[in-house]
Amino acid sequence: MAAHRSAHQPRDPDWELRGRASFARQPLMQTLGVTLEALAPGEVTMAMPFAPHILQQHGFVHAGALTALVDNACGFAAMSLMPKGTGVLTVEFKMNLMSPGKGDRFLGVGKVIRPGKTIMVTLGECFAETKGERKLVALMTATMMVVDSPGIVD
C-alpha cells in the first residue's frame, strides 16, 4: 500500500505506525472484514467485501455497515493529523445514501477538509465496486474531535 502526496502535514512523526496499530485493535472492522487500502496524511481509504452477514432484508449491504466503513475512514483521516498522545472521537456526522449497497466490495474514503486543533471537519465517500467499476453510493460529512484524555489514545 503506497502513500501518496498530501497537502496536510502530520503532527506526529509516527502517525502511520500509530494509525495501523489502532486500526488493528478495532473488532468491528474485523467483523466487517474491512482492510486499510491507502493511508496518507489527511486521507484514508478502507475496503469492505460484500458478505451475507452485512445485508439487510432486501439483499443490499446494510446502511449501518456502509456508515461504519465511511465513519472509520473519516476518523482515521483525522487521526493521521493529530498530535501524539491524543485520540479521535466522532462528534457528529450526516450520511446521504444515494444508491443501494450492491457490489463486490465497498470503498470508504475519508478526507480531512479542515484540520483544526480540537475539531476536524471531514468528507467521506462510499463507492460500490463491481468488476473494477466504481459507483458513488453515499456521501458523509463528519466532525471529529481531538481528544486529550487518559484512556482515549490511538
What do the predicted segments below correspond to?
Residues 1-47:
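Non-catalytic linker/capping segments at the edges of enzyme domains
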Residues 2-3, 8-13, 100-154:
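HotDog/MaoC-like acyl-thioester-processing domains
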Residues 66, 87-89, 94-97, 118, ...:
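Residue-level recognition of specific faces of alpha-helices
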Residues 61, 76-107, 112:
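Hydrophobic beta-strand-centered segment that forms part of the acyl-chain substrate-binding groove
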Residues 30-32, 42-44, 87-93, 104-106, ...:
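A generic structural signal for short beta-strands and their flanking turns/coil linkers
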Residues 24, 49-73:
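Hot-dog-fold acyl-thioester-processing enzymes
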Residues 48-50, 97, 146:
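Hydrophobic residues in beta-strands and at strand termini
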